[in-house]
Amino acid sequence: MPIKQIKSQHDLSLTHAKWLKQKYKNVEHHLLEMDKIFNSFSQVLNKFDNEHGYANSRARLRMATLYQVAAANNGIVVGTGNKVEDFGVGFYTKYGDGGVDISPIADCNKSQVWELGRHLGVSEEIINAQPTDGLWNDGRNDVEQLGMSYADLEKAMENKDDPNYQKYLEIREKNLHKMNPIPVCTFNE
């Protein structure tokens, strides 16, 4: 579901889709170009121009699309978030890539996800690719957005004495609103 995707990121996605289809006979590949939808969305909301808002809107448009495809196929939406992203630092878009029905790898650190990929025979090109959400026009990757590598985040999450622990806590604090239950107003009877 490319939305104004950087060519190298899109090409890598196509490589992975091709590998999946060849390896697993039950995989269907659907290329859904989302540029027109996003362009219309951006034009309607042009007076509310905000780069970060548009990046998150891309994730939310993808989520809505995934739920439509799932509904049409009597299916569910499967998440791709890992423990560092989902529970460590909240590195996902609320109601975007965080909007899923099940999250099978959410208890795995990123290093475990890479290890699992190798075990399953996933191409090293894909495993070694710089992680990115693909939501930014400039092609920024996860490390650039987070300011830390996944290896450093994992170490900091597991060890309060790690030199990056405070930085990890700062990132986490900024995103707790995504990981905590939605605040509600309660009334006494």
What are the residue ranges of the model-derived segments?
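A generic local structural motif
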Residues: 63-65
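ATP-dependent adenylation/pyrophosphate-handling site
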Residues: 1-17
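ATP/NTP-dependent adenylation/nucleotidyl-transfer catalytic domains that generate, transfer
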Residues: 4-5, 20, 24-37, 43, ...
